[in-house]
Amino acid sequence: MYYPEPIARLIESFSKLPGIGQKTATRLAFYTIGMEDQDVNEFAKNLLSAKRDLRFCSICGNLTESDPCAICTDPTRDRTTILVVEESKDVLAMEKIREYRGLYHVLHGTISPMNGISPDEINVKSLITRLMDSEVKEVIIATNATSDGEATAMYLARMIKPAGIKVTRLARGLAVGSDIEYADEVTLSKAVENRLEI
């Protein structure tokens, strides 16, 4: 189908986003074209601002405006527990339940032998280093219930247990193959409460 070049470029840009196919990208492009100039400018400004102003915390790897992040510097957090997640959006999901008061570590992915992603390509080394110099007594592994999430959890458990640190996994109120990001707050709360030792 023929579209003027500016619309075609916009459709292509939207289609690069995860979960956005050609049809949705086309719908978003035409919606954006129909928006008021002020709203388009605000959208563009917010997008550029987020890209420019956010960075990864040098301690936990979470997205933040300041380094270290607000969670790592919060003196009221339980420093004896670290909850390990795949992505920053998982931290947000866990914070919503207001049950967990420890620290976090964001891996930025999972080990995936099928996709050629090794432990060196995710944020594992800094976790191990962090554990060696800390008062951490428990690491809760909260990777997604997928084959890659399970492989990552087992690898982390093998790396951490020799240090004498308790390693637990979120309980299975989460369906196999599901992402933490999409779990409801009650399910997440119960998964943390009933976590299992690995």
Curated annotation (Swiss-Prot):
InterPro entries named in the record: DNA_Rcmb_RecR, Rcmb_RecR, Rcmb_RecR_Znf, TOPRIM_dom, TOPRIM_RecR
Disulfide linkage: none
Zn finger (C4-type) location: 57-72
GO BP terms in the entry: DNA recombination; DNA repair
Database matches in SMART domains: TOPRIM
A Pfam entry, by short name: Toprim_4
Record keywords, A-Z: DNA damage, DNA recombination, DNA repair, Metal-binding, Zinc, Zinc-finger
GO molecular function, one term: zinc ion binding
Residue intervals of the Toprim domain: 80-175
NCBIfam families: recR
Function: May play a role in DNA repair. It seems to be involved in an RecBC-independent recombinational process of DNA repair. It may act with RecF and RecO.
Protein family (similarity comment): Belongs to the RecR family.
PANTHER family from the UniProt entry: RECOMBINATION PROTEIN RECR (PTHR30446:SF0)
UniProt protein name: Recombination protein RecR
Chain's gene name: recR
